[in-house]
């Protein structure tokens, strides 16, 4: 979809309600609960990715990409939702994908999607966008947080070491919130598919740290 910019007068002094009202009355697009965003450069062009946690079919959520063509125009694409194929089955991921909340980007430009599900059921998905066109070909479950009551948030990759990631764990039933450092000994190859092997290594480390993996 092609998009254009709406200029809101005195936006820097407007309250949240006024900004939303101004967008809607100006024929702007209303997304349901946008939560997080990442920006990366592809072929010299900046692309913005954001998670709309409760948008889409039955409020399940979706992730969008916006190619920033110029100061006044952009191209909006549906990056991932429940209709995106699951990597290991080649069928739509369906109800397994629910309420994408946070995003993360690794040193190779790959996008990770962190869910906001009830504690103990939240997944982190690796988005396979092999050609970097802003539309994920498939999703692979990268990690699952099975700790009772807990929610993963704030996934972050070390900018100086692609083998290291950090994940915040909050709302645990044990009341023991923490930040976990995950590291592997696999040296990533310069292709997106190699991240699957790296991801499997991280899942194993994550499971050992926080408990049994969900199957």
Predicted regions and their residues:
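Short, charged juxtamembrane terminal tails flanking transmembrane helices
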Residues: 211-215
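Sequence/structural signature of beta-propeller domains
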Residues: 1-186
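Short, surface-exposed linear patches
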Residues: 165, 208-209
